[in-house]
Every structure is written in C-alpha cells, then in structure tokens.
A protein has these predicted regions:
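Short, conserved catalytic or interaction motifs in soluble domains
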Residues: 34, 59-62, 79-82
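Short, acidic/hydrophobic/Gly-rich beta-strand patch recurrent on exposed beta strands
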Residues: 11-14, 41-46, 105
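Zn2+-dependent peptidoglycan hydrolase active-site motif and core
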Residues: 23-58
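Conserved, short, structured surface segments that act as functional micro-motifs
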Residues: 66-125
Length: 125
C-alpha cells in the first residue's frame, strides 16, 4: 500500500532528493504530466503493448510521441527546497537521504506485471 493506504499493482522505491529518473531502455513517451492521485507521471512504451509507468516525480521531461534513447532523462524527484543552490551543493548531493518515493508499474497488454521481472534493483550503500 502507498502512503494513502491504497494498494496498487506496482512498487514503491525510496530515492534521494533531486534524483534523476531515466529510461531503462529506448522507449516512446506516451504521457508526461499530472495524473489524478499519482502526481507527475511519465508513461513510456518500450515495445508494443508494454508500458512503464513512473509516478511521484516532481518534474517530467519529454513529449507524447517522442522517442527516447536508453538512459534518457524522463523525470526529476522532488526535495525540500528545490532550487539550483540546493541542487548543486556538495552537502545535498552527498547526503544519501532516501526521502522521496518513486512508484514504478509495468503493464503488458493492460495487465499489471511484476516490476521485479522487468527491472534489476540495486540497493545503494
């Protein structure tokens, strides 16, 4: 369940403030913007019938129909006071705080899939 107690078919991972969220593979942007109670969302289609949904972003990048190469920036996580001074200070960049929540959902032909079958997650030390 998420912070509101809603059970969703994806997973929630903790990220650092201001973390970049990138496309794991080349994909077409299907949507980038606000989506009901998911906040700012980026929906990518790496192949026909497959959707990667990234939600909980502070800012999204890309336009619907845009084809993104692998590792392209699709979003930016939020933080307490997002501004260029905080973003670039060594203290902020090296704080290691995992205070943001990124929701990841995978769908195949509109059926939820287990994200762990699609992504490799490494715990940062």
């Amino acid at each position: 369940a998420d912070a509101a107690g809603i059970v969703r078919p994806g997973i929630i991972i903790r990220t650092k403030e201001y973390a970049f969220v990138t496309s794991p593979v080349a994909a077409t942007v299907r949507y980038a913007g606000p989506l009901s109670d998911y906040g700012m969302v980026s929906i990518l289609e790496p192949s026909e019938g497959i959707l990667f949904i990234f939600a909980g972003l502070n800012k999204v990048f890309g336009e619907p129909g845009q084809i993104l190469p692998e590792a392209s920036l699709v979003g930016l996580m939020g933080g307490e006071n997002i501004n260029i001074e905080n973003f670039t200070t060594e203290k902020e960049l090296n704080s290691g705080r995992l205070s943001q929540s990124l929701y990841i959902e995978v769908r195949r032909n509109d059926e939820p899939q287990n994200p762990f079958d699609w992504f490799e997650f490494n715990k940062e030390e």
